[in-house]
Amino acid sequence: MIERGKFRSLTLVNWNGFFARTFDLDELVTTLSGGNGAGKSTTMAAFVTALIPDLTLLHFRNTTEAGATSGSRDKGLHGKLRAGVCYSVLDVINSRHQRVVVGVRLQQVAGRDRKVDIKPFAIQGLPTSILPTQLLTETLNDRQARVVSLNELKDKLEAMEGVQFKQFNSITEYHSLMFDLGVVARRLRSASDRSKYYRLIEASLYGGISSTITRSLRDYLLPENSGVRKAFQDMEAALRENRMTLEAIRVTQSDRDLFKHLISEATNYVAADYMRHANERRIHLDKALEYRRDLFTSRSQLAAEQYKHVDMARELQEHNGAEGDLEADYQAASDHLNLVQTALRQQEKIERYEADLDELQIRLEEQNEVVAEAVDRQEENEARAEAAELEVDELKSQLADYQQALDVQQTRAIQYNQALQRWSAKALCHLPDLTPESADEWLETFQAKEQEATEKMLSLEQKMSVANRAHSQFEQAYQLVAAINGPWRANEAWDVAREFVRDGVNQRHQAEQAQGVRSRLNELEQRLREQQDAERQLAEFCKRQGKRYDIDDLETLHQELEARIASLADSVSNAQEQRMALRQELEQLQSRTQTLMRRAPVWLAAQNSLNQLCEQSGEQFASGQEVTEYLQQLLEREREAIVERDEVGRRKRAIDEEIERLSQPGGSEDPRLNALAERFGGVLLSEIYDDVSLDDAPYFSALYGPSRHAIVVPDLSRVAEQLEGLEDCPEDLYLIEGDPQSFDDSVFSVDELEKAVVVKIADIQWRYSRFPALPLFGRAARENRIETLHAERESLSERFGTLSFDVQKTQRLHQAFSRFIEQHLAVTFEDDPEEEIRKLKQARGELERTVSAHESDNQQNRVQYEQAKEGVTALNRILPRLNLLADDTLADRVDEIQERLDETQEARFIQQYGNELAKLEPIFRCCRANPEQFEQLKEDYAYAQQTQRDARQQAFALAEVVQRRAHFSYSDSAEMLSGNSDLNEKLRQRLEQAESERSRARDAMRAHAAQLSQYNQVLASLKSSYDTKKELLNDLYKELQDIGVRADAGKKRARARRHELHMQLSNNRSRRNQLEKALTFCEAEMDNLTRKLRKLERDYCEMREQVVTAKAGWCAVMRLVKDNGVERRLHRRELAYLSADELRSMSDKALGALRLAVADNEHLRDVLRISEDPKRPERKIQFFVAVYQHLRERIRQDIIRTDDPVEAIEQMEIELSRLTEELTNREQKLAISSRSVANIIRKTIQREQNRIRMLNQGLQSVSFGQVNSVRLNVNVRETHSMLLDVLSEQHEQHQDLFNSNRLTFSEALAKLYQRLNPQIDMGQRTPQTIGEELLDYRNYLEMEVEVNRGSDGWLRAESGALSTGEAIGTGMSILVMVVQSWEDESRRLRGKDISPCRLLFLDEAARLDARSIATLFELCERLEMQLIIAAPENISPEKGTTYKLVRKVFNNHEHVHVVGLRGFDAPLPEALPGTADAS
């Protein structure tokens, strides 16, 4: 019998109160006795820390600690240690008698968190003579020692031979070693296992029924059915793997779609850019050639325009020079014509003004006479009126006042005064001796003098009148002379006028002849100018024709030019029609090319599809009929492959069924036999012979024959009753009576033959059976057959997969052919449009060259035609003047006539000044008058007038004196005043007469004054008009003299000359303007050509540079394309017909899709981002290659046999479809039935209930106080029991859960549990978690601890219903049961030669009475368990070992004094060694 391992000792180093203390542990009970604070709990804490060095679990608290939680910062360990290195070490002797030292090194960590550092270690192979304290301390002297560090301990142990020291970095490794060496009862793999172990020790330490232990009894007592669970897990794992594989297939299908999308978009992205660059390269080359062609053409055009410009510039310069001369001549002719016209107008004005002046002079003379007469009468009227006024005044003065009128004296006094006033004549007449008496004499003298002055004045006035008329005629004659020959001196006018009149008579005859001469000269000059114009035109014509022609050849040339015009006109007309025909043909070619270019992409797509079909089928098709015939062959091939595939599938399913049948446990081919065997209490015959060898299998198979599937029962009579009404069984059911444990084949009489047996069933019934070729009797035979079937199934599966692949491939090929026929068959076998396009392009090039040549010829013909027309036009102007051109004497005749005209030129003024001479002739004699004599006469006349006025005044003054001579005698009348009434009356009458006379005189004077004013106004007006016209006439004479021409008949000639010059100037200007416009147009054309040439040169250089630059990149692109073999994918000819914008749009759209497609692939994303550089097209090829490489790396070479991703995608679709079908079938086979699950769980529950009953038998004798017995009740929960019933009998009602592909079996089980128990709240747990719990049988069970207490009978063990001692005893019993259960569960994991240590704790054992303690001792002895009890000093057990602990303080140094004693019933009680204090 294997001995159980025991804990030998516990060593504490540097704990609080213990410096180096070793407690030897008793084989049963070790008691720690001492008062409060003696160190009992510290010792137990050191033991527990060495067992479970997990700081997350350790929490040492007092039993009286209130409110303690696991979250407290101080777990109680820090305060039990001292500063420095501390140790807690267990010395163990296991079942193999191996000494194992396990423990932990502890050290306080500085800080307010009160943490402790723990390092577990183990020592193996340590000699028994070496105590743990010798290893952990170093003696310095007799009174001092020190604790060694862990490294020093390691070094010390490594120095010992055969000793192994191991330090652990994890608690799991530490516990794994302790489990393997038998120190702990269970392998503590996880924190959960350690927690269970710690809670168990904690429950034993503090005693009582722990609620934690009670709630977790299932976890402690019921072992995990790992086999069943693993079977479920394997099934679910297989299903999960199968479904994951299916999901992976779906993902792969989505990846396939992604791959297709990726390769499609990548192809679009790169191919569009590739073809765009190819198109652009071709376009750039064409443009470069076109630019070069245009460059050469422009250069030739520029040279031609430059030559043309030079010619036109030279001609324009000639015309400019001629225009200057013509403008000068024209301006001179215009000026001369203007002068002639001005002179004529002036002459007409002069004649008109002279007529007006003559008329005005006559009227003025008449008006002067009228005014003179009117003045005389006015003077007479004034004198008369004045005399009347004087008389009236005198009478009024006399009659003003009657007193005054009567006072004559006063009047005389007044007269006297007036007479005195008249005495002023004395001074006026220069007569100082004048007296009133001598006044008469002097009056006569002065009147005679007045008469003489008046006569002299009248004589001078008459002379003055004659002199005025003569002077006027002189002025008129002088003006005419000045008008004819400019101003002269007045004294020379007579001689000049007489010469003019005499010469005018002589030259008038010559002037009459000059008109005819001048007309003849004008005619000849006109003909001369026409001749000169004709010569100029002929010179221009010859210059334009580039050849000198004689006058005689012009008519012939005219006929030749007309003939040439006719022929060229026909040629131009025909050329127009021919050009239209060529243009129309060119448009037809372009239209045909456009149609073919639109059809080409469709044809290319059809060809690509046809090529793919040819590659897939390996055939070549030349017509649509061949395609349809091959499609019919595909249909036949598909039908044959489907038939063969279905046959292989049927055989495969048959083999699967046979394998399933042979795989039944016990060799039962019918599952009903197992149920019947269980029902009858028998065993299948195949189970009895399950171990038969492969060689004996044919014999026993033939021996039993049809009864090889019989049921062996102990007693047939007991079965007979159950056979009545039996329906659920095979058609033939064989029952054999016998003992299944000692069954043999002696029930038959058998004769063995060669490969056969004869079985004598009865005397009248024999059975002959040959050995089967494939024996199935016995496990070996079945396994052999299963292996054979598996091999055959593998070959059939491979063949089925191949056929399925071929069928799907054929179906896809059929679909491809169907799509091809539907979409492309109509255009596939038509002629190649690209070839026809190339031919049309060649034809179009030739046609364009023809059109260009025709345009050039037509342009030359047009130029010749225009030149001929211009020549004919010029000849049409020249031919009518051939006579003039031939007349060589014209210039001589003009000179001759010019000489004759010069002779008559002197008489030209007769025509110009004929009127002046006609007027001058009658009055030229007036020119004799001397203007200076007229001025002297005017002065004499003025002097005579002044003398006559002075004489008149003197005579008048003397007359006044003579008249008032009587008044001088009234000197004394002032004093004499008297009146006379008669005289007053007379005076009044005279006054009335005088007033009337005065009125008549006044009226006459006023009327005559008004008339005189009118006469004066008329006279002033006439004088003003006369003076104005005289001044104008003088101005006109002066202007005419300034003009310096004579208005004669040359006006017509001047106008004709000016008109001729104007026509020449206009023609010259018109030609010059034409040349200037042509020159400007030529310069503009040259500028345009120059700019165009520069632009063409720049564009050509840029394009050539671009072509050369792009060539390197394109070569790199082509090298990449050819090296990687992707040209077939990228060179999509149908894209060549799309524009650059369409290709760029296509590439951009594909780029957007690719960004989304490669968003999760960093490599492709980076390559794609790099490839977006438009200047580096090769990077797009690199991206395409990277995509291909990426897809190649993801091709399953074991499934897909190609390197081309496109072909791989096609094969992938076929293979994935086949795998999906196979995995779906496999999932249906893997799925376990719900009834099987219920049966497995029920059997497991029954087994565990039986085991718990066996454990209860060991607790029946346990008693504590009133507790007589302890037991465990195991019951199935009602909700779970209902679930099992439904799974076994009503599962078909819930097949919607178990047949769902979306749910695993665990999830379906959880859904069913929720459906059956809707009132239970599942919380946040997932269906998978709930299902996994429902697959664990432990969750179906409820466990309760019951005690048989006194008269109450069996009660549920609760701390409230038990005393403290009863609770502690009951709990300890349950814990012992748990430990034993753990050992039983772990026995298969640990070596069979090891029995683990058993040790529990009990603190504060004073709560138990002596009987209870004795019961614990008996329990420990019976179960071979060690127990450590902490008790106060009043407990002294009779058995085991007791340590008395006393804490003392010496010299401020605290230590625990320990004394150990054996039990009282020991034969020789003695103190245990090592009890001395080592503090």
From Swiss-Prot:
GO terms for biological process: cell division; chromosome condensation; chromosome segregation; DNA replication. It is found in: Cytoplasm, Nucleoid. GO terms for cellular component: cytoplasm; nucleoid. Residues 665-782 are annotated as: Flexible hinge. It comes from the Bacteria. One of its GO terms (molecular function) is DNA binding. Keywords: ATP-binding, Cell cycle, Cell division, Chromosome partition, Coiled coil, Cytoplasm, DNA condensation, DNA-binding, Nucleotide-binding. InterPro entries: MukB (IPR012090), MukB/SMC (IPR050308), MukB_hinge (IPR032520), MukB_hinge_sf (IPR042501), MukB_N_dom (IPR007406), P-loop_NTPase (IPR027417). Residues 138-163, 331-664, 831-1112, 1206-1257 form a coiled coil. Its main location: cytoplasm. ATP binds at residues 34-41. Belongs to the SMC family. MukB subfamily. Homodimerization via its hinge domain. Binds to DNA via its C-terminal region. Interacts, and probably forms a ternary complex, with MukE and MukF via its C-terminal region. The complex formation is stimulated by calcium or magnesium. Interacts with tubulin-related protein FtsZ. Plays a central role in chromosome condensation, segregation and cell cycle progression. Functions as a homodimer, which is essential for chromosome partition. Involved in negative DNA supercoiling in vivo, and by this means organize and compact chromosomes. May achieve or facilitate chromosome segregation by condensation DNA from both sides of a centrally located replisome during cell division. PANTHER family: CHROMOSOME PARTITION PROTEIN MUKB, DUF4476 DOMAIN-CONTAINING PROTEIN. NCBIfam families: PRK04863.1. The hinge domain, which separates the large intramolecular coiled coil regions, allows the homodimerization, forming a V-shaped homodimer. This is Chromosome partition protein MukB. It comes from Klebsiella pneumoniae. The gene is mukB.
